[in-house]
């Protein structure tokens, strides 16, 4: 049964879904990494595809920008289509001088200036954390591929152009590795819905140093992150 935002039929989605923000990235992942992939939804041009990776059925779908957008799609995927695992694959801006552009961050947890998780807990704080098994798989996959990654907390913001510039220094002092716009929302949806989630983030820009990747570097590093995400997906037992 379709939802207001997803037109797929029952069974069209695999139980594991990779979610980039950009729907064109979803098409790219489908074309480059999946075998026998087909488009399963295109409502509002938020494209979704299902195929196989090394024989394991996997889906990929865009989630748009920000906590509200990813929350809508993740909720409908989990509750209507039976998705059990969602892996966000996106970009982030580094907050620490110890973190370099091109690095991939395994987001073990996410603070946020969004109010969505407090709404879930009637005004109380919620520990928005990744599924431990998924995070461990990502670290192990990176080690096998000899790909340096970092594991640690990130900060999810509702504002891309944030007026409180002093916040960055505070976050860095507290050990937050990077800022992005969706992970805390995804982890909240997963916890509320009994699903599991992980955020894998490529450092595309450095907020402190001003360094950023070239378009070619972004593509290459993005591919390395997708390979890690697919390794994590492939290791998930089929239901």
Swiss-Prot record:
InterPro entries: DeoD-type, Nucleoside_phosphorylase_CS, Nucleoside_phosphorylase_d, Nucleoside_phosphorylase_sf. It catalyses: a purine D-ribonucleoside + phosphate = a purine nucleobase + alpha-D-ribose 1-phosphate; a purine 2'-deoxy-D-ribonucleoside + phosphate = a purine nucleobase + 2-deoxy-alpha-D-ribose 1-phosphate. It holds the Pfam family PNP_UDP_1. Gene3D superfamilies: Nucleoside phosphorylase domain. CDD domains: PNP_EcPNPI-like. GO terms for biological process: purine nucleoside catabolic process. One of its GO terms (molecular function) is purine-nucleoside phosphorylase activity. Its EC number is 2.4.2.1. Phosphate binds at residues 21, 25, 44, 88-91. Disulfide bonds: none annotated. GO terms for cellular component: cytosol. The active site is at residue 205. The record marks 218 as: Important for catalytic activity. A purine D-ribonucleoside binds at residues 5, 180-182, 204-205. Keywords: Glycosyltransferase, Transferase. Belongs to the PNP/UDP phosphorylase family. Catalyzes the reversible phosphorolytic breakdown of the N-glycosidic bond in the beta-(deoxy)ribonucleoside molecules, with the formation of the corresponding free purine bases and pentose-1-phosphate. Homohexamer; trimer of homodimers. NCBIfam families: deoD, PRK05819.1, PRK13374.1. This is Purine nucleoside phosphorylase DeoD-type. The gene is deoD.
């Amino acid at each position: 049964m379709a939802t207001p935002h997803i037109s797929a039929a029952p069974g069209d989605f695999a139980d594991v879904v990779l979610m980039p923000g950009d729907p064109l990235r979803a098409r790219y992942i489908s074309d480059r990494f999946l075998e026998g992939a087909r488009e399963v939804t295109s409502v509002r041009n938020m494209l979704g595809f299902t195929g196989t990776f090394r024989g394991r059925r996997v889906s990929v779908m865009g989630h748009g920008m920000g906590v509200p957008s990813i929350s809508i799609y993740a909720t409908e995927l989990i509750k209507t289509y039976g998705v059990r695992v969602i892996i966000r694959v996106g970009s982030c801006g580094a907050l620490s001088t110890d973190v370099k552009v091109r690095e991939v961050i395994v987001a073990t947890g996410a603070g946020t200036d969004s109010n969505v998780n407090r709404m879930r807990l009637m005004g109380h704080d919620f520990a928005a954390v990744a599924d431990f098994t998924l995070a461990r798989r990502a670290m192990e996959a990176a080690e096998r591929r000899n790909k340096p990654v970092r594991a640690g907390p990130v900060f999810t913001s509702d504002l891309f152009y944030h007026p409180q510039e002093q916040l960055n220094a505070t976050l860095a002092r507290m050990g937050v590795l990077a800022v992005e716009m969706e992970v805390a929302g995804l982890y909240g949806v997963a916890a509320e819905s009994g699903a599991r989630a992980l955020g894998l983030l490529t450092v595309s820009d450095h907020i402190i140093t001003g360094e950023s990747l070239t378009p070619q570097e972004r593509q290459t590093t993005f591919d390395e992150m997708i390979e890690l995400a697919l390794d994590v997906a492939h290791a998930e037992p089929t239901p």
